[in-house]
């Protein structure tokens, strides 16, 4: 895997080429001070919200006496999050353009390993503060910012990366409709269900039609149009059988090979379908693998990512002030949602 392949898989590189085949998205350059904030290993205090209006303060007046008085203890230091008012305005405007709810990511990765921290265990965001909460809790995002060229074989200097916040219009995607496709020398050689930790009966039953529709989509819209001849693409097949492009990834170890191995994919040896699927495999078509029974269901790989030290402290009671910060953030988010509901606003 070469560094150029990684560069070509950046969202801003491929989106202009394939935007009519994917989810509507907006791309915003990230200021350096925001990048510094995301890389800060300090206490998880989330910025990006400017909703401390007088109405909220009035609603909280009855409970002011119960709040922790930070200034009463001279040994206590108040930890406040930096604010980025100009960036916050741009992000909120973009979110509104996309309907009010978005799915965030950086140049390459989304914070899929951090959905456990969200109130609804979802990557759906409506504000910059919610995006920051996910980003600062994600090892995937940290990898993008610090080691984007890990596993690259060339010794050339690392290309300069201009980091960007990608906001994708929120869409309810059924995990059983997501598939990862492996392309070598501009040929689709393998397809695998994206969420291989679960068994979806419809995938096994519709394997032939799924393979056919994905292969046709690849030939009509992707083949020979991506800058590299070796790459990985994620697609979504909806209930009507239409295929949508979701993402591109480098063809190499930095990308999860799911139910295949990288030795199989790079050598082409033993690159076959599951034994139970060989009868339905397309002649000269891609190898197709899926989790074919409940017996082979596996735990999600995201469960292996450790909880940040800050939250370990919360559970053990070692840092009460971090717990207070976290609870105040959650209370603020809940109050904002309640105010929106009272005003009759509904997410689009």
UniProtKB/Swiss-Prot annotation:
Sequence positions that bind ATP: 105, 108, 110, 112, 168-170, 178, 180, 194, 234, 247, 249
Q: Which GO terms describe its molecular function?
A: ATP binding; magnesium ion binding; protein folding chaperone
Q: Which domain of life is it from?
A: Eukaryota
Where is there biased composition of kind Polar residues? 49-61
Q: Where in the cell is it found?
A: Cytoplasm
Q: Which UniProt keywords apply?
A: ATP-binding, Chaperone, Cytoplasm, Magnesium, Metal-binding, Nucleotide-binding
One GO biological process term is: eukaryotic translation initiation factor 2 complex assembly
The region called Disordered is annotated at 49-68
Where does the chain bind Mg(2+)?
247, 249
Task: Give GO cellular component annotations, separated by semicolons.
Answer: cytoplasm
Main function = ATP-dependent protein-folding chaperone for the eIF2 complex. Binds to the gamma subunit of the eIF2 complex which allows the subunit to assemble with the alpha and beta subunits.
Entry's family note: Belongs to the CDC123 family.
Name this protein carries in UniProt? Translation initiation factor eIF2 assembly protein
Species for this entry = Danio rerio
